[in-house]
C-alpha cells in the first residue's frame, strides 16, 4: 500500500507540474489574435457617379463600358475599354442607339445626332450583339476623329491669323508727328493770305501792285466836268499826279 500511495503522489505532482508549465507558456505568448471575420471586408465603388454603364477598371485609371441587353434579364454587353470616362459614356450611347434607337437612354443628349450608328435591334438570340459592339466602337472612333480634325483646323486658323503680315497703313514716327503739327499752322496761314488777297497768290498780288506804280498815269481830262462842279473847283484844273 505504501508503494501505491507513493505512485499516486508522484502522479499528482507530475500533473501539477505540467499544468503550471502550460500556464506559464500561455502567459508568455500573450493573448491569441482575434479571428478575421468572414466575407467581404472592404467595398470600393467603381461605377461612375454620373454616366450610365461606365465604371473604372484597375489602378491605371481606365474606364470600361458595359450595357444591359434590353429584353434579356441579367445579360450584359461588353463594349470596350477607354482612356476617359467621356469616351466610355459615348460608347454606351452608341450601343444603346444601335439596340433601342430613338427610345434609348443616353448619357449625352447630342449623341442622337453626333454619333452615326446604324440601327441593329437585338433579335431573340444574341446573334446581333457582336454587330452592336462593332458599330458602337466604330461610331466612337469616328466621333473622336471628327473632334481631332476640328481642333486641328481651329489651331491652324489661329496660327495663320497670328503670322499674317502687318497692314500697309503708314506708321508715323514722332518726327513725322512734329512735322505734321508744324506744317498745320503754315497751311492755315497760307489759306488766310489767300483770303486777304482775293484768292490771288501773295507774289502775284505784290507784283500787280508794283506794275501799277510803274505804268504812266492817264492824261488829264480836257474839261473839268468830270471832276468838279461849278462851285467846288471854279473851273481850275487839278493835277492828280505829281
From Swiss-Prot:
Residues 20-29, 148-184 have a biased composition (Low complexity). One of its GO terms (cellular component) is nucleus. GO terms for molecular function: DNA binding; DNA-binding transcription factor activity. It is found in: Nucleus. Residues 50-109 bind DNA. InterPro entries: AP2/ERF_dom, AP2/ERF_dom_sf, DNA-bd_dom_sf, DRE1A-I. Its main location: nucleus. Keywords: Activator, DNA-binding, Nucleus, Stress response, Transcription, Transcription regulation. It comes from the Eukaryota. Pfam families: AP2. Residues 20-44, 143-184 are annotated as: Disordered. Transcriptional activator that binds specifically to the DNA sequence 5'-[AG]CCGAC-3'. Binding to the C-repeat/DRE element mediates high salinity- and dehydration-inducible transcription. Belongs to the AP2/ERF transcription factor family. ERF subfamily. This is Dehydration-responsive element-binding protein 1J. It comes from Oryza sativa subsp. indica (Rice). The gene is DREB1J.
Amino acid at each position: 500500500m505504501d508503494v501505491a500511495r507513493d505512485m499516486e503522489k508522484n502522479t499528482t505532482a507530475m500533473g501539477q507540474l505540467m499544468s503550471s508549465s502550460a500556464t506559464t507558456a500561455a502567459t508568455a505568448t500573450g493573448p491569441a489574435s482575434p479571428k478575421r471575420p468572414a466575407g467581404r471586408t472592404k467595398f470600393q465603388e467603381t461605377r461612375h457617379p454620373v454616366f450610365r454603364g461606365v465604371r473604372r477598371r484597375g489602378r491605371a485609371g481606365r474606364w470600361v463600358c458595359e450595357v444591359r441587353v434590353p429584353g434579356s434579364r441579367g445579360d450584359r454587353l461588353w463594349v470596350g475599354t477607354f482612356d476617359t470616362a467621356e469616351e466610355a459614356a459615348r460608347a454606351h450611347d452608341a450601343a444603346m442607339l444601335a439596340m433601342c434607337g430613338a427610345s434609348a437612354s443616353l448619357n449625352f443628349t447630342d449623341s442622337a445626332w453626333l454619333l452615326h450608328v446604324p440601327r441593329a435591334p437585338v433579335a431573340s438570340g444574341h446573334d446581333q450583339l457582336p454587330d452592336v459592339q462593332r458599330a458602337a466602337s466604330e461610331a466612337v472612333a469616328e466621333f473622336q476623329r471628327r473632334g481631332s480634325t476640328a481642333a486641328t483646323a481651329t489651331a491652324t486658323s489661329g496660327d495663320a491669323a497670328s503670322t499674317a503680315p502687318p497692314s500697309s497703313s503708314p506708321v508715323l514716327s514722332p518726327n513725322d508727328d512734329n512735322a505734321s503739327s508744324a506744317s498745320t499752322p503754315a497751311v492755315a496761314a497760307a489759306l488766310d493770305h489767300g483770303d486777304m488777297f482775293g484768292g490771288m497768290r501773295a507774289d502775284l498780288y505784290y507784283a500787280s501792285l508794283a506794275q501799277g506804280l510803274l505804268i504812266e498815269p492817264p492824261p488829264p481830262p480836257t474839261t473839268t466836268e468830270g471832276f468838279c462842279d461849278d462851285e467846288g473847283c471854279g473851273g481850275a484844273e487839278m493835277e492828280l499826279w505829281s
